[in-house]
């Protein structure tokens, strides 16, 4: 047990406000109504206690008593099991496996393109945003079939998709033409959820419970 973790009596999330993986975890914490301390991290000057807790020095890092977790997927699945209501993973193993595959594809296919849009040259940014916009419009029927991403209920897959769309919105992407109505309706649904508003600091937490 590290001394850094033993000092913390409240669940703590080391995060950075601009990091998409941290945003995922914040949505889950808000969905679950968990009381936690957010420790904002300057990625250019990592705090010593984070380095002591996480050998990779990455965010998000979650500290829950003696347990230290890093990697957003591991953190989110832990939170979903630790705080079962509301459930964010589907009941049946086949459905869960399909959701995990979707999350993997989003992380591998879309997130690197988003990183180019955020950190690349102007040419790379323009190309990346165009690619993401076209790919999302290309799957627009998926957004139309169900209230949430391939699901009747809000779940972990939405915690991958919603932060991506939020980033695109703030990068100036506007969805127009065929398929845009379904995507914009989805964005409206997820962006107005209490959990999402809390995750971006635009609403106060509600019905919080501590982690004991």
From Swiss-Prot:
Domain GST N-terminal per the UniProt entry, residue ranges: 9-87
Alphabetized Pfam families for the sequence: GST_C, GST_N
SUPFAM superfamilies (UniProt xref): GST C-terminal domain-like, Thioredoxin-like
Gene3D superfamilies referenced in this protein's UniProt entry, alphabetically: 1.20.1050.10, Glutaredoxin
GO cellular component terms given for this protein: cytoplasm
PROSITE patterns: GST_CTER, GST_NTER
GST C-terminal domain residues: 92-212
InterPro entries documented for this protein: Glutathione-S-Trfase_C-like (IPR010987), Glutathione-S-Trfase_C_sf (IPR036282), Glutathione_S-Trfase (IPR040079), Glutathione_S-Trfase_N (IPR004045), GST_C (IPR004046), GST_Omega/HSP26 (IPR050983), SspA_C (IPR034342), SspA_N (IPR034341)
Coiled coil, from the record: none
Family assignment from sequence similarity: Belongs to the GST superfamily. HSP26 family.
Function: Forms an equimolar complex with the RNA polymerase holoenzyme (RNAP) but not with the core enzyme.
Name of the protein in its database record: Stringent starvation protein A homolog
């Amino acid at each position: 047990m590290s001394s850094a973790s033993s000092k913390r009596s409240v669940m703590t999330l080391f995060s950075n406000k601009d990091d998409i993986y941290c945003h995922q975890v914040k949505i889950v914490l808000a969905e679950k109504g968990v009381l936690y301390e957010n420790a904002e991290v300057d990625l250019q000057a990592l705090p010593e206690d984070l380095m002591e807790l996480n050998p990779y020095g990455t965010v998000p890092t979650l500290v829950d008593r003696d347990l230290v977790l890093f990697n957003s997927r591991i953190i989110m699945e832990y939170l979903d099991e630790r705080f079962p209501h509301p459930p964010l993973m589907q009941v049946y193993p086949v459905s869960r496996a399909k959701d995990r595959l979707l999350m993997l594809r989003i992380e591998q296919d879309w997130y690197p393109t988003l990183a180019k849009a955020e950190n690349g040259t102007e040419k790379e940014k323009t190309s990346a945003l165009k690619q993401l916009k076209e790919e999302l419009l290309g799957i627009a029927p998926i957004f139309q079939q169900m209230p949430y991403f391939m699901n009747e209920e809000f779940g972990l897959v939405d915690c991958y998709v919603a932060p991506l769309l939020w980033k695109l919105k703030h990068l100036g992407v506007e969805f127009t033409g065929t398929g845009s109505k379904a995507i914009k309706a989805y964005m409206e649904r997820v962006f107005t959820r209490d959990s999402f508003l809390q995750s971006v600091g635009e609403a106060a937490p509600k019905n919080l419970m501590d982690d004991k």
